[in-house]
Amino acid sequence: MRKIAIAGNWKMHKTQAEALEFLQTFLPLLQDTPEDRDVILCAPFTTLTALSKNLHGSRVQVGAQNIHWEDTGAFTGEISGPMLLETGVRYVVVGHSERRQFFGETDATVNQRLKAAQNHRLTPILCVGESKAQRDANETETVIFEQLEKGLVGVDQKNLIIAYEPIWAIGTGDTCASSEANRVIGLIRSRLTNHDVTIQYGGSVKPDNVDEIMAQPEIDGALVGGASLAGDGFARVVNYQ
């Protein structure tokens, strides 16, 4: 059975103090949130321990935004699975388009990170999606299928979330039409061996469009960027109708 998962991706936002201030607004607004919705905050490394401590016993889980495939080593600036486990996280974003675009992430390194996450009992959120140029060239399916084929080698699809994030819709205010997002996510599902994998939509998800997005039958959740930074706004997304 497919699970619903709403995840906020804070990216490089929020100090520890700002993260805890967010919780004061956010948590009281979840009292009536349906129990079948997993709520996840994917936060900067420096806030993970504080968030985990303050969310203990709540319905909100904590996620990281990256993981290295080695447990230790000379990898300046990276973070490993054992380090993440120590902070109390349960999820980790892997292969976000910003990592692919700005930090040289490839399908091969994405695959290594996915397997590292699973080896440490973390649930990875694999991001896939096409650029504007690729969509205009009718290459959406080709690009995404290649990302899936190369990224999922040796990956356990029973411990996995996938987020479809059309790159042209991330942080731009442009949202993929909900019907088109539903179509692409259906295609993604058709390429999986486990058809019960939770597949999210990401890309300018906001309080004023989340209801329409989540009404689509193939969409199991959302990976939310800018709209996850304000407690009241993200609560509205989590509490979609």
From Swiss-Prot:
GO terms for molecular function: triose-phosphate isomerase activity. Its main location: cytoplasm. The gene is tpiA. It is found in: Cytoplasm. Its EC number is 5.3.1.1. It catalyses: D-glyceraldehyde 3-phosphate = dihydroxyacetone phosphate. Belongs to the triosephosphate isomerase family. It comes from Acaryochloris marina (strain MBIC 11017). This is Triosephosphate isomerase. InterPro entries: Aldolase_TIM, TIM_sf, TrioseP_Isoase_bac/euk, Triosephosphate_isomerase, Triosephosphate_isomerase_AS. GO terms for biological process: gluconeogenesis; glyceraldehyde-3-phosphate biosynthetic process; glycerol catabolic process; glycolytic process. It comes from the Bacteria. Keywords: Cytoplasm, Gluconeogenesis, Glycolysis, Isomerase. Homodimer. Involved in the gluconeogenesis. Catalyzes stereospecifically the conversion of dihydroxyacetone phosphate (DHAP) to D-glyceraldehyde-3-phosphate (G3P). GO terms for cellular component: cytosol. Pathway: Carbohydrate biosynthesis; gluconeogenesis; Carbohydrate degradation; glycolysis; D-glyceraldehyde 3-phosphate from glycerone phosphate: step 1/1. The active site is at 96 (electrophile), 165 (proton acceptor). PANTHER family: TRIOSEPHOSPHATE ISOMERASE. Substrate binds at residues 9-11, 171, 204, 225-226.
